[in-house]
Amino acid sequence: MTPAYDETYLPDAMVNLAGAFDYALNDCGLPASLFIDFFVTSDVAELFGRGVPKYVCGMSGEELVAEIMRQTGWTRIIDMPPATPRTGATLEYWAGWVLAYCQWARGVRFEDILEVLPFDDIVRLYPTLHEAGESRFVDVYDERAARNRIEGDSRCTRFACAPDSANPNWPVVLASLCAPSKCTNSATKTSAKPLSLVCLP
C-alpha cells in the first residue's frame, strides 16, 4: 500500500499530531469525541493527510488545534490556553502519534481510521502496544478493518441477498446494507420490472 506522503515528513507529522491531541484534550479540556469531530470536518485533516508541509511540519500541535478551531468557528486563537510542560507522553499524545503513523502508512482518511478504531479504542490499546512499535498498531487497524468488511459482506448476504419467497419481484436488496462498490442498479431502460439493487460478489 502506498504511503500518504514522503517519509521525510513523517517524524514531524507524528510529533505535531500527537501534540495536537494532547493539547486539545488535556490543556483545552475538549472532549475527545468533540475534538475529533472538529478535526475530521476541518480542512486540516485532509491537508495533513496529504502531507502538505504547512500542516505536517509547519505547525506545532498547539497551532494545529488553533487552526482546527478557527476553521470550525468555535474559538479565536487568543482564547487558547497555554500548553502545560510535560515530562512524559500522555495517552492522548500516544494516540495522536500512532494515528498519524497509521494514516501515513495506509494512505486513507483519518475519518476512515477512526471509524474502524474509535479514539477510545486507540487509547485502550496503549498498555499493550506502546512498546511494540507503530507498525503493530497498523496491524491491529488492518485486522479490525478486514473483520469489519467480512461482517459487512456477511450482513449483506444474510439480510439483503437472501431470496424472499413472498416477493414476486425478487431480487430485492436492502441498499443500506450493501457498500456502494458492491451494489449495482439491475434495472434497464427497457425493463418493466421495478427498480432494484443487486449485491455483487
Give a label for each model feature.
Residues R155-N169, V198:
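Short basic helix-loop element that most often maps to the first helix and adjoining turn
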Residues N26, C161, V172:
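Alpha-helical residues within the helix-turn-helix
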Residues E7-E67:
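N-terminal interaction modules that seed assembly of large macromolecular complexes
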Residues F39, D164-K182:
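Short alpha-helical DNA-recognition segment
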Residues V65-G73, A192-P201:
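DNA major-groove recognition helix of helix-turn-helix/homeodomain DNA-binding modules
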Residues P53-T87, L91:
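Long, compositionally biased
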Residues T84-E143:
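A charged, amphipathic interaction segment
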Residues R50-P53, S176-T190:
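Recognition helix of helix-turn-helix/homeodomain-like DNA-binding domains
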